[in-house]
Amino acid sequence: MAPSANPQNGHRGEQDLDLTSSAVEHRLAENQPSATNTAGAASNGVSQPNVQELDASKLTYTFTENPREIPALGVTADNGNSICTDHMITVKWSAKDGWAAPELRPYGPLSLMPTASVLHYATECFEGLKAYRGYDGKLRIFRPDRNCERMLMSSVRISLPSFAPKELEKLILALMSVDGPKWLPRERPGSFLYLRPTMIGTQSQLGVQAPSEALLYIIVSFMAPMDAPEGGMKLHTSPDDMVRAWVGGFGYAKVGANYGPSLMATKEARARGFHQILWLYGKNGECTEAGASNFFVVWKTREGKTQVVTAPLDDRLILAGVTRNSVLNLARERLAEEVEVVERKYTIDEVIEANAEGRLIESFASGTAYFVCPISLIHHRGSDVQIPAGKGGEGGPITLRLKNWLVDIKYGREEHPWGIVVSEEH
């Protein structure tokens, strides 16, 4: 064994206890000197190069000369391909110089070398958020600050560059300010667009290493409404030989590597008539996520107390969903006299037991794509757990209230600080 791998006296040094957290701190210092105590100095005291930070005020504009037609209402894809708006934003980064000036330019292909880091080592992260045309005529984005903060966490987790989340938010708003008025016209209240900020490692060199070049880009696309399936969502629990995430891993980060390995099980579940996988973890079968959405149950305790229960964030098994956070906040603020909001580990056996005892009231999934979606059935090891899901599977009373409150905020029926209004004066 190499001497460096042989701790003295059988004890691990303090510097070995949390390598990932230390690496994240150093990554932040490298690309955000203004966010550190001393500009240009990392937390380990090593002098850092004077690199450029991400700066939305440097955004340049090159408008398309070939604008495309907006698809008819209800059309969201073209021969199976996503339909995107006229423009996108790109920003290059290098370890030597930091962030280049952002560019708003016509939507089109990216140029990558076959040896680009992202194509071999999954150095990729992304976010998903929506812009809404309100019934009051205004254009809004729902809580973009939360998505930008989460993208920073995802980026540094896979050794991509850091940035100030507020600058990314400004770029998102700038892109929607240009494309929003055309692609979400006032004549289509109640419609939305899907925004996808993405960062990829672009360094053209094979070898397992942190990329020294990266590209941040933001695109906007149409997406079919993923409303609650008729009768409610049906889940199939994950097989014993497969997990989506694990303690000490990266299930909490929105990285592409979390999604590809789950597609096989999801495809098989859909072939059997189910909509998503309910991902279980550990020998006790802890409930974690429903597909790529956060999972909730509403039940009564044996003492008669109604609880809204979801998995916790402290072990980093699940994604800290923006909709999840919004649901929890609204439940605590507006349902405090009716329900107790609980974030804890709970198992599929607890769900089955609550159902058998008549204590399982409702269940739903939350996320940007499915929003708040009632769950009507969970299939586990050959048996079905039937869950009350309201009339037509549209959701029970608690699910519906939470969903309707969020709809009102997103579409401007309720003025709320979560709905960020986009300027349309560009």
Identify the role of each PLM range.
Residues 321-326:
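Feature captures the catalytic cores and cofactor-binding loops of soluble hydro-lyases/lyases
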Residues 2-276, 282-286, 329-426:
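Conserved alpha/beta cores of soluble small-molecule-handling proteins
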